[in-house]
């Protein structure tokens, strides 16, 4: 069965560095490994804009990163699919979303599905 490892720590403490090294070591040992970040589950750019417009006086919803700015349903579907080994599509692969923070002039947007990781 799959093993899921979650890392939670403050910004700038080395999570990406640790995870990159773990991935390298696991793949070198012959294990299939996928890395994802909570950032990969931000709302799409259009959804972010709609949320900000719906709550114009809430500064926490004007930018990504705060509670309420993630697609939790997509995150749960993806994690469940990874632990089951398929995402319900006919090819039995799991598509892991990616988020492009540089899109829309730095406001960010979910990357097109063609750029998602497939395992």
Positions of PLM-derived features:
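Conserved nucleotide-sensing/catalytic segment adjacent to the nucleotide-binding pocket
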Residues: 34, 41-103
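Active-site signature of alpha/beta-hydrolase-fold catalytic machinery across serine-
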Residues: 21
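Hydrophobic positions on the alpha1 helix immediately C-terminal to the Walker A/P-loop
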Residues: 18
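Post-Walker A helix-loop "phosphate-sensing" segment adjacent to the P-loop in P-loop NTPases
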Residues: 24-34
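Conformational switch/transducer regions in large eukaryotic molecular machines and scaffolds
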Residues: 98-117
């Amino acid at each position: 069965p799959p093993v899921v490892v979650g890392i939670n720590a403050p910004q700038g403490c080395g999570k990406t560095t640790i995870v990159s090294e773990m991935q390298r070591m696991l793949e070198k040992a012959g294990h299939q490994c996928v890395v994802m970040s909570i950032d990969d589950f931000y709302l799409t750019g259009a959804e972010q804009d709609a949320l900000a417009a719906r709550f114009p006086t809430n500064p926490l919803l004007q930018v990504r990163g705060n509670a309420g700015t993630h697609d939790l349903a997509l995150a749960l579907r993806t994690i469940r699919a990874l632990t089951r080994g398929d995402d319900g599509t006919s090819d039995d692969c799991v598509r892991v979303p990616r988020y492009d923070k540089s899109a829309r002039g730095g406001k960010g947007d979910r990357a097109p599905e063609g750029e998602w990781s497939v395992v």
